């Protein structure tokens, strides 16, 4: 679990409570996803973010769906804020519960564009480090799960082999 700093807790709570609704809305409509994003953030609380996304979407004609997490890190390093839109696309496909990391990226970018982010004191390196840390942690968790599954399978195989050997021995003794 990412370390949640006290001043970020309300942000994450709000984000998590609206995330499911956002995912459902984006997947059910046929308009371009960034247009759906604008619709989602039309509430007064998110007006500033909608303006930022609208400006980026109008300013840059690009295939936003081609943006990947690795390209996001490159964009952060080079200061290309168009990746804010890519982040929201990444969030849309984020079904593994990693929204906090994505939202940390998003908050950082909003700060760079609007100077109103709760992550105002985070640097590029710190934000990228958060993501790398989270990715490594998830990888280790997956690795542990795989090892556990493999050991379970190995135990089942041993049990089956033992049963087979016992059955063969019983058959020989009865013959």
Swiss-Prot record:
It comes from the Viruses. Residues 153-175 are annotated as: Disordered. GO terms for biological process: symbiont-mediated suppression of host apoptosis. Keywords: Early protein, Host-virus interaction, Inhibition of host apoptosis by viral BCL2-like protein, Modulation of host cell apoptosis by virus. InterPro entries: Adenovir_t-Ag_E1B_19kDa (IPR002924). Belongs to the adenoviridae E1B 19 kDa protein family. This is E1B protein, small T-antigen. The lineage of its organism: Viruses, Varidnaviria, Bamfordvirae, Preplasmiviricota, Tectiliviricetes.
């Amino acid at each position: 679990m990412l370390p949640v700093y006290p001043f970020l807790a309300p942000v994450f709570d709000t984000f998590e409570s609206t995330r499911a609704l956002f995912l459902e809305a984006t997947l059910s409509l046929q308009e371009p996803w960034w247009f759906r994003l604008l619709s989602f953030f039309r509430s007064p609380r998110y007006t500033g973010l909608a303006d930022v996304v609208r400006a980026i979407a109008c300013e840059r004609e690009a295939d936003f769906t081609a943006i990947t997490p690795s390209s996001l890190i490159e964009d952060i390093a080079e200061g290309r804020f168009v990746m804010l839109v890519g982040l929201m696309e990444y969030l849309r496909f984020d079904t593994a519960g990693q929204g906090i990391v994505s939202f940390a990226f998003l908050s950082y970018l909003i700060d760079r564009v609007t100077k109103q982010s709760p992550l105002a004191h985070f640097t590029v390196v710190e934000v990228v480090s958060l993501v790398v840390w989270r990715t490594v942690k998830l990888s280790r968790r997956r690795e542990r799960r795989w090892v556990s599954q493999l050991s379970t399978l190995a135990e089942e195989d041993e049990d089956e082999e033992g049963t087979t050997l016992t059955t063969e021995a019983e058959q020989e003794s009865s013959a």
